[in-house]
Curated annotation (Swiss-Prot):
PROSITE patterns: RIBOSOMAL_L35. GO terms for biological process: translation. Belongs to the bacterial ribosomal protein bL35 family. This is Large ribosomal subunit protein bL35. It comes from Nostoc punctiforme (strain ATCC 29133 / PCC 73102). Residues 24-48 are annotated as: Disordered. The keyword Ribonucleoprotein applies. One of its GO terms (molecular function) is structural constituent of ribosome. Residues 31-42 have a biased composition (Basic and acidic residues). Signal peptide: none annotated. It comes from the Bacteria.
Length: 65
């Protein structure tokens, strides 16, 4: 059986934790930041877990994660 290919776009966006959960960065912190509050920008800097309903799709895109 041939090797499974990894979706490179997904590989750049998702990482696995030590316990196997998938983490992602929050969107909206690359530009147009001037009108956003400091609290908003600080909360967007943190990583968050991928929702359980999206986790299967991410795992299919990253077979070796």
């Amino acid at each position: 059986m041939p090797k499974l290919k990894t979706r490179k776009a997904a590989a750049k966006r998702f990482r696995a934790t030590g316990t196997g959960k998938i983490v992602r960065r929050k969107a909206g912190k690359s530009h147009l930041l001037e009108h956003k509050s400091s609290d908003k920008k600080r909360s967007m800097s943190k990583t968050t877990l991928v929702h359980e309903r999206d986790e299967l799709n991410v795992r299919l895109m990253l077979p070796y994660l």
